[in-house]
Amino acid sequence: MIPEVSNEASQPAAHRQENVDPNEIAKFDAVAARWWDLEGEFKPLHHINPLRLDYILERSGGLFGKNVLDVGCGGGILAESMAREGAKVTGLDMGAEPLAVARLHALESGVMLAYHQQTVEEHAEAHPGAYDVVTCMEMLEHVPDPASIVRACARLVKPGGEVFFSTLNRNPKAWLMAIVGAEYVLRMVPRGTHDITKFIKPAELLGWVDDTPLREQHIIGLHYNPLRDRFYLGGNVDVNYMLHTRRQA
C-alpha cells in the first residue's frame, strides 16, 4: 500500500469545516516543514513519542496486524511508529501541509500507511466500527468541539476495541507549566501554541466518554524534568495526561 493523502473533495466545504479552527490549521501549516526536525518546534513530540507508543502497546496488547486510526496525526510521528509495530495505520488530519510532510516522510522511510485530509466525524460516518485501536493525541485542545471528536472516536472503534486520548488539564499549574514554562521560559514550543481556555479537565473528558459506549480503563500523567530534559509517566494528571478507554462489547 502506497501512503496517500486523500483530499475528499466531494465533501461539502461547510460540512468539512464545522469542527475545525482555521487559526489552528494555519498555525501548524506554518511550521509543518520542520515536523521531523528533532531539534525544531516539534522536539517535545519526538521526545514523548516513545512514552506514548509504549503506553499504547502495553494497554492494547500490541498493535501487530491491527487496524489503527490516528486522529489529528499531523506530520505522522505517532502514526509511523505504530506502523513500524506492524499495525495497518490510517492517519487523519485537516492540515494540508502537515499531511504533505507526513506522506513524504513515509515514502522516504518506506513505512506503509495511509493519510487522509478529512474530519473524524466524516470518517466515522463512512467507517463505523472499522478500527481495533483509535488514538487521538494532543488534538482535543485544538478543536472547537472536543466532545464531538470523542463521540466520533467511539463510533469508529470496534466493540472491545481501544481508544486513547491525550490532552492538557485546565488549572493554574497547567497554565504555568504548559504555557509560561514551555512557551516563554524554556521555549520548547512556539508562543501561542496553546490556549488555556481550551485545556480539558479529566472530569470533563471522562464525562464525554461516559456519554458514549467507551469506558475508562486507565489514566496517567505525562511529566517533564527540565534539569534532566526528560519526559516520564506518573500518577499526577495536573498538566499533561493520557486516557485509555475501551468500547463495550
From Swiss-Prot:
GO BP terms in the entry: methylation
Superkingdom to which the source organism belongs: Bacteria
Any Pfam family hit: Methyltransf_23
GO MF annotation terms: 2-polyprenyl-6-hydroxyphenol methylase activity; 3-demethylubiquinol 3-O-methyltransferase activity; polyprenyldihydroxybenzoate methyltransferase activity
Metabolic or biological pathway, per its Swiss-Prot or TrEMBL entry: Cofactor biosynthesis; ubiquinone biosynthesis
Database matches in CDD domains: AdoMet_MTases
Enzyme class of the recorded protein, top EC level: transferase
Keyword field: Methyltransferase, S-adenosyl-L-methionine, Transferase, Ubiquinone biosynthesis
Gene3D superfamilies named in the record: Vaccinia Virus protein VP39 (3.40.50.150)
Reactions it catalyzes: a 3-demethylubiquinol + S-adenosyl-L-methionine = a ubiquinol + S-adenosyl-L-homocysteine + H(+); a 3-(all-trans-polyprenyl)benzene-1,2-diol + S-adenosyl-L-methionine = a 2-methoxy-6-(all-trans-polyprenyl)phenol + S-adenosyl-L-homocysteine + H(+)
Region (Disordered) location: 1-21
EC number(s) on file: 2.1.1.222, 2.1.1.64
Residues binding S-adenosyl-L-methionine: R52, G72, D93, M137
Family: Belongs to the methyltransferase superfamily. UbiG/COQ3 family.
HAMAP family noted in UniProt: UbiG (MF_00472)
NCBIfam families per record: UbiG
Function as written in the Swiss-Prot or TrEMBL entry: O-methyltransferase that catalyzes the 2 O-methylation steps in the ubiquinone biosynthetic pathway.
Name recorded for this polypeptide: Ubiquinone biosynthesis O-methyltransferase
Biological source species: Sodalis glossinidius (strain morsitans)
